[in-house]
């Protein structure tokens, strides 16, 4: 099978694509890949580092307001379609999949026009502009949230989940806890604000640190590398309790996620896919700075099923943070109910499900 993949801009579009590629390599070692992205996106460094052939096209996203820039964007889109057709003809894929971000627009559109089987994968509960546009032309739209399905033609929608979920399975949670200094018998909560950290969460944590020192559970706090020194400076003035461990970054996140009892985090699509696959209860603090407020809608999908609590950033204080953690971790029945609810939402074999959809299209 020859697979052409496109997606970029943010890790949320790139990492699911890489997880899918790794799964296909396991199931079909003869498979060949080409990844098309932009020169300036994260994908231009991440994808080649993963050993996957990479080509770039020049493209930009549409402004949401009427603008002269949109005229340039249309011109770039048309040029991107022509460049994509050239790469597609040269690579001769059996199937093309777009994982979101404006770069996959011309690539997947070009493939559809050339009669090649096409899929888009939508990670969020609120679809991006590019995937909504492409849904008119592709064969299938793979989604991760039920809420996303209503935005697409129903005959094309398949619920596959996020391939990243598959990569957190079969991890050693005890090893994960030991690696960061958590004790095995105690309950623990992991608090983090995404790969780069989040200042409002850092501020609430610093305010709460003295009260955390009185708790029976342990706290693992991840600041994000850029915030670490500032947080540690503030913590030094208040004192760092023995049951609070602070790290700038965690390199073995799947192991650590498996080991802890509760997670406090943003509500990005990849994070929620991993948490539900593992059956982890969570307190979700959606980022209010994302397009279409999609993180709050992602969180709502999990909260409504009883698998998480939602704490809006505007309501985030030391008191509300501790309150929500205590209500879950200190109540065995609540913790158990939320574990079950999260597990029912999870799709741990998401990468395999997406590969099956691809296989069916190729064999048609």
Curated annotation (Swiss-Prot):
This is UDP-N-acetylglucosamine--N-acetylmuramyl-(pentapeptide) pyrophosphoryl-undecaprenol N-acetylglucosamine transferase 1. InterPro entries: GlcNAc_MurG (IPR006009), Glyco_trans_28_C (IPR007235), GlycoTrans_28_N (IPR004276). Keywords: Cell cycle, Cell division, Cell membrane, Cell shape, Cell wall biogenesis/degradation, Glycosyltransferase, Membrane, Peptidoglycan synthesis, Transferase. Cell wall formation. Catalyzes the transfer of a GlcNAc subunit on undecaprenyl-pyrophosphoryl-MurNAc-pentapeptide (lipid intermediate I) to form undecaprenyl-pyrophosphoryl-MurNAc-(pentapeptide)GlcNAc (lipid intermediate II). Pathway: Cell wall biogenesis; peptidoglycan biosynthesis. Belongs to the glycosyltransferase 28 family. MurG subfamily. It is a peripheral membrane protein. The lineage of its organism: Bacteria, Bacillati, Bacillota, Bacilli, Bacillales. It is found in: Cell membrane. It comes from the Bacteria. It catalyses: di-trans,octa-cis-undecaprenyl diphospho-N-acetyl-alpha-D-muramoyl-L-alanyl-D-glutamyl-meso-2,6-diaminopimeloyl-D-alanyl-D-alanine + UDP-N-acetyl-alpha-D-glucosamine = di-trans,octa-cis-undecaprenyl diphospho-[N-acetyl-alpha-D-glucosaminyl-(1->4)]-N-acetyl-alpha-D-muramoyl-L-alanyl-D-glutamyl-meso-2,6-diaminopimeloyl-D-alanyl-D-alanine + UDP + H(+). One of its GO terms (cellular component) is plasma membrane. Its EC number is 2.4.1.227. GO terms for molecular function: UDP-N-acetyl-D-glucosamine:N-acetylmuramoyl-L-alanyl-D-glutamyl-meso-2,6-diaminopimelyl-D-alanyl-D-alanine-diphosphoundecaprenol 4-beta-N-acetylglucosaminlytransferase activity; undecaprenyldiphospho-muramoylpentapeptide beta-N-acetylglucosaminyltransferase activity.
